[in-house]
């Protein structure tokens, strides 16, 4: 979930001011599944889910925007933008032929394996050829939020609000 947290923090470009999380485990061990809802200062709301219980691999992101829905499938390397359109097409004499209620754009993506790309980037940073894509402040912020999500799952009755923006 740490990569999802980092991605959402980067996309939202605002501090997290609200947090609600739930999850659990199947036995006496680490947490098996988590669902966290993050509220950002700028009004963005993000919902993250991570599960070790599912037999299906799911790595996706949906972003609800003012005039579109963006859906990304990281495993299949697809990105679709759903846009609303309210255009009416009619014949010369006013008879309705059809209505375009929306359209879907398919954005071209690369099929680079994310783990390979991450390790390659790490090696380039160690060799001094690149600077880290995620700096220390970004990583610290993501880790702090991951820790708060874990605390909320471990102690669901605490009801402790997020005291300071992250």
Segments (PLM) and residue ranges:
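Rossmann-like dinucleotide-binding domain that binds NAD(P)(H)
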Residues: 1-56, 60-64, 74-76
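A general structural signal for well-ordered alpha-helical segments in protein cores
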Residues: 4-8, 116-120, 146
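C-terminal helix-rich "cap/oligomerization" subdomain common to oxidoreductases
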Residues: 41, 121-166
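Solvent-exposed strand-loop boundary residues in beta-sheet-rich modules
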Residues: 42, 67, 85-87
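Short, mixed charged/polar active-site loops
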Residues: 45, 69, 102-106, 131
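Short polybasic amphipathic segments
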Residues: 61-63, 77-90, 95-98
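Short, solvent-exposed cationic patches
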Residues: 67-76, 165
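Active-site loop of classical SDR/Rossmann-like NAD(P)-dependent oxidoreductases
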Residues: 106-120, 134
């Amino acid at each position: 979930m740490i990569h999802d947290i980092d991605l959402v923090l980067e996309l939202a470009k605002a501090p997290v001011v609200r947090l609600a999380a739930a999850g659990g485990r199947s036995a006496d061990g680490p947490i098996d599944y988590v669902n966290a809802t993050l509220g950002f200062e700028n009004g963005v709301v993000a919902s993250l889910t991570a599960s070790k219980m599912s037999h299906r691999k799911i790595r996706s992101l949906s972003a609800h925007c003012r005039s579109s829905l963006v859906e990304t499938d990281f495993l299949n390397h697809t990105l679709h933008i759903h846009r609303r359109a309210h255009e009416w097409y009619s014949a010369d004499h006013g008879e309705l032929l059809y209505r375009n209620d929306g359209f879907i754009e398919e954005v071209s993506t690369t099929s680079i394996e994310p783990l390979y790309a991450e390790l390659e980037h790490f090696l380039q940073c160690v060799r001094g050829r690149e600077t880290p894509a995620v700096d220390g402040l970004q990583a610290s912020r993501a880790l702090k939020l991951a820790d708060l999500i874990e605390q909320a799952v471990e102690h669901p009755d605490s009801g402790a609000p997020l005291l300071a923006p992250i």
